[in-house]
């Protein structure tokens, strides 16, 4: 292949990535997410006061954030942190493995909870009062590759569940019946 053919091929490849990057940038700007880190994007979407479902798709796996406008899918790696979103409930829940930031709706929106996450050695990772978002979920960023327990309490009722933050772990925990 000649030098000019290589340059043309390189230019086409570069312009393809530039087009993909500009489409992703336009999507982020359209939804008020431009200039944010992946953590900030996740927090912004999960905590939005808009009713579900949102006008775009956003879901989080153990390794990446997936955004879509229905035509293209944009994926952003999470890096060294893990996002766990959970929805305590009193009466009803839904099955969930990967949290849909744009679609999941829990039973108890805008409620105060006491949240505690401990690792398998008993070290406290998170311990604080948190309010569920409009979608009824609460999200926490945790260290990757840990096992532990999530405990939640509300009005004298408690729920707990084993958790893990590995590459194959769930990011949506809805099995938290308050008793």
Roles of regions detected by a PLM:
Residues 1-7:
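Bacterial N-terminal signal peptides that target proteins for export
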Residues 146-154:
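A short, solvent-exposed beta-strand micro-motif common in secreted/extracellular proteins
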Residues 76, 82-89, 167-179:
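Extracellular beta-sheet/turn segments enriched in Thr/Pro/Gly and aliphatic residues
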Residues 80-124:
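Mature extracytoplasmic domains of secretory-pathway proteins
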Residues 15-20:
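N-terminal signal peptide c-region/cleavage motif recognized by signal peptidases
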Residues 21-84, 94-100:
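Terminal, intrinsically disordered low-complexity segments enriched in charged/polar
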Residues 122-135:
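Short, acidic Ser/Thr/Gly-rich low-complexity loop/linker segments typical of extracellular
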Residues 132-140, 150:
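Glycine-centered loop-to-beta-strand initiation motif
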């Amino acid at each position: 292949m000649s030098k000019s053919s290589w340059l043309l091929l390189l230019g086409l490849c570069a312009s393809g990535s530039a087009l993909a990057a500009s489409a992703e940038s336009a999507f982020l700007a359209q939804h008020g997410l431009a200039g944010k880190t992946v953590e900030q994007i996740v927090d912004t979407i999960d905590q939005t006061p808009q009713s579900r479902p949102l006008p775009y798709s956003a879901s989080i796996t153990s390794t990446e954030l997936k955004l879509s406008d229905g035509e293209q899918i944009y994926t952003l790696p999470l890096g060294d942190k893990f996002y766990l979103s959970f929805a305590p409930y009193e009466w009803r829940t839904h099955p969930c493995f990967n949290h849909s930031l744009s679609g999941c709706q829990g039973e108890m929106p805008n409620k105060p909870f006491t949240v505690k996450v401990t690792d398998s050695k008993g070290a406290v990772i998170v311990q604080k009062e948190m309010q569920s978002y409009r979608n009824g979920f609460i999200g926490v960023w945790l260290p990757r590759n840990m096992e532990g327990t999530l405990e939640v309490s509300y009005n004298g009722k408690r729920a707990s569940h084993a958790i893990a933050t590995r590459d194959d772990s769930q990011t949506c925990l809805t099995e938290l019946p308050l008793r």
